[in-house]
């Protein structure tokens, strides 16, 4: 089964690219391929001139730091055993040499940017509404200050009244 065939695009810095199509056409698969969550069976994938399909540790590290994804289901994408602070700090722990205090400061700053309160830092995902969980997922996707954020229907699971608020 071919999920994607003949897909080609260039994303310019500072621009938004929307991939539109009917259910099952491969939009989510494309997002997972771009982040290498799934490995392409063919084709090419370049980021800033680097072939991301080569098994080059530098290219893999670059991809992890500069290309992030926000999944459409915040219920399934947040580890229920970790507190919000841990969830947000994890990308920094893996990809930077920041101290524990620096990671905490960055996590708290990002929480403020997405409209979460300081006291939410020590709470678990199940303690939040769908809109708040999606804000946590968005915050996690932005923690490494990526160049590219792939948003896989980031508000599809939310009530219409909450969608605009989360997107803003």
What is the meaning of each model-derived region?
Residues 1-168:
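ABC transporter nucleotide-binding domains
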């Amino acid at each position: 089964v071919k999920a994607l065939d003949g897909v080609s695009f260039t994303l310019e810095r500072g621009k938004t690219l929307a991939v539109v199509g009917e259910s099952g056409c491969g939009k989510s698969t494309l997002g997972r391929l771009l982040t290498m969550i799934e490995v392409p069976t063919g084709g090419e994938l370049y980021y800033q001139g680097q072939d991301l399909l080569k098994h080059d540790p530098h290219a893999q590290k670059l991809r992890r730091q500069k290309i992030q994804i926000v999944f459409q289901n915040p219920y399934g994408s947040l580890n229920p055993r970790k507190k919000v602070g841990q969830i947000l700090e994890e990308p920094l722990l893996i990809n930077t040499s920041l101290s524990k205090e620096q990671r905490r400061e960055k996590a708290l700053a990002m929480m403020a940017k997405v409209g979460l309160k300081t006291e939410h830092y020590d709470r678990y995902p199940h303690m939040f509404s769908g809109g708040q969980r999606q804000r946590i997922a968005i915050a996690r996707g932005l923690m490494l200050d990526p160049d590219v954020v792939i948003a896989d229907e980031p508000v599809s699971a939310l009530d219409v009244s909450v969608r605009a608020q989360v997107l803003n």
